[in-house]
Amino acid sequence: MTLGSPRRGLLMLLMALVTQGDPVKPSRGPLVTCTCESPHCRGPTCRGAWCTVVLVREEGRHPQEHRGCGNLHRELCRGRPTEFVNHYCCDSHLCNHNVSLVLEATQSPSEQPGTDGQLALILGPVLALLALVALGVLGLWHVRRRQEKQRGLHSELGESSLILKASEQGDSMLGDLLDSDCTTGSGSGLPFLVQRTVARQVALVECVGKGRYGEVWRGLWHGESVAVKIFSSRDEQSWFRETEIYNTVLLRHDNILGFIASDMTSRNSSTQLWLITHYHEHGSLYDFLQRQTLEPHLALRLTVSAACGLAHLHVEIFGTQGKPAIAHRDFKSRNVLVKSNLQCCIADLGLAVMHSQGSDYLDIGNNPRVGTKRYMAPEVLDEQIRTDCFESYKWTDIWAFGLVLWEIARRTIVNGIVEDYRPPFYDVVPNDPSFEDMKKVVCVDQQTPTIPNRLAADPVLSGLAQMMRECWYPNPSARLTALRIKKTLQKISNSPEKPKVIQ
C-alpha cells in the first residue's frame, strides 16, 4: 500500500462493523432485516440493529464490498471515507441492498491548485516564521530525548522514530518489524512505544470469533491482516499476563502465535484491552477439524508442529537469548491455531506459569481464571496437584495434549472411514460440563476417551494411539514429556515406511 508524500504522516483507518448472522446482544430499538454478503454470512440476509455496507481495499487487491448487520459501536458509522475504506449505515428494511460506495480519490500533484505571486509574497514570511518555530520545537525535542535516554528510554524512542519514517515512505512494515521471527528465541515483544503506535493504526474489519473472555477480530494494519483479541473487562488479568509474558520472554518460534503489539485503548468512552498477533485465516484447530477431514500425513503434520510448540514452551533455554520454562495451563484445540502452511501454533498464554532454575522462582501470576474443565487432568480435578512444583503444571499440559491428539485422530481417514468431530468425553458429560461432572468421569470412574479400533490399521495412527495412552497415565510423573513426544513424532514422520510430513 502506497502512502504518498511523507508530509501526509501516518494513515489512520476507520472501519464500520459487519457482523455475521443474527445478533446476540443487539442495540436498543427494533431489529431490521439486511442484505448479507460477506464470507461469514449464514444466508442472504441477517438481522441486526442497523444495516451496513463496507468498501475496503487491501494491499495488492481490488476493492471489495461487504454487506451485513451492525450491532455494536455505532459511533464508527460516522467515520469519513478514505482512499482505502468507505462505509454506510442505514436503519430500514433491506436498505443496504442497492447501495454502492466509492473510495475517496487521491489528488495528484497536477490537480493541486497553483498559487499566484501575490499569495506567495503573503505566505513567505508566515512560512519562514513557522519554520523557525519548528526548528525551536525540534531543538527542544532533541534535549528531551537526551534526557529520556538517560532514563533508559532511548532505544524505544529510536524504534518509534524508525517506524514513523518507514510508514511515511510506504514500506511493507509488518514483515520488517517481525523479521526476527524464527524457530528459536530471538527477541521478545516490540518496544512499548512502537506497540502503541502499531495498535492505534489498526482498523477493525470483521469479528471472527467470540468467547467468554472477549472477541477476536481481523484487523488491517497498512493493508496487512492482523488478529486483534479484545479482552472483556473481567478478564483484564489474562490480558495483563499474556502481555507480560510476550514482553519479557523470548518467545519467537514458528509454532507459537506471533505477537505484534498490546495496548489499552479507549473506544466509545470505554476502555478496551487489545492484543495484536499474526492472523491465521484457518482459525483454531477446533474450527479446522469440524470442517476438514485429514489424511494421515496431514494429521502427523499437525501433531508434530503442535508438539514442537509445546516443547519450546516447556524447555528452559539458557544464555542471553534464553527463556524460562513455561507451562501453558489451558492447552486445548481452541487455543491451537492452524497456519496457512497447515502447521499448528499455540496461542492464549493468559494462564501460563514461568519457572527459572537459576532463581528457582515459580511465577504463577495473579489470575483468578481457571483452565477449561473438559481438558483438566485428574490431579487438578481432585485438587491433588502440587501448586508449588513447576513440573506439575507441565504434566497437566501433557494430559491435555493427549486429548488434542485424540481429536485429530478421530478426523483422520483410515480405509475410507472417519468419525465426525466431537470434543473429548462428549459421550459421558454435557456440552458445558461442571467441575463435578468431570471429576466423576476422570477421577472416580477413571475414564479416558475411547480410542477407535480402526487406528490400529494405520502405522501412523497406531503410534498416535499409543502416545495418547502414555499421555493419560493417572500418575502424572509417568506421562511422556513434551520433548519425548516431539522426538517420537518426528521419528514417525521420518520413517521410510510412514507417510512423509511435507515441509
Curated annotation (Swiss-Prot):
Carbohydrate attachment residues: N98
Reaction equation(s) it catalyzes: L-threonyl-[receptor-protein] + ATP = O-phospho-L-threonyl-[receptor-protein] + ADP + H(+); L-seryl-[receptor-protein] + ATP = O-phospho-L-seryl-[receptor-protein] + ADP + H(+)
Location in or out of the cell: Cell membrane
Record SUPFAM superfamilies: Protein kinase-like (PK-like), Snake toxin-like
Family matches, as InterPro entries: GS_dom, Kinase-like_dom_sf, Prot_kinase_dom, Protein_kinase_ATP_BS, Ser-Thr/Tyr_kinase_cat_dom, Ser/Thr_kinase_AS, Snake_toxin-like_sf, TGFB_receptor
Domain Protein kinase: 202-492
Membrane topology of the entry: Single-pass type I membrane protein
Record topological domains on the Extracellular side: 22-118
Pfam family, one: TGF_beta_GS
Stated name of the protein: Activin receptor type-1-like
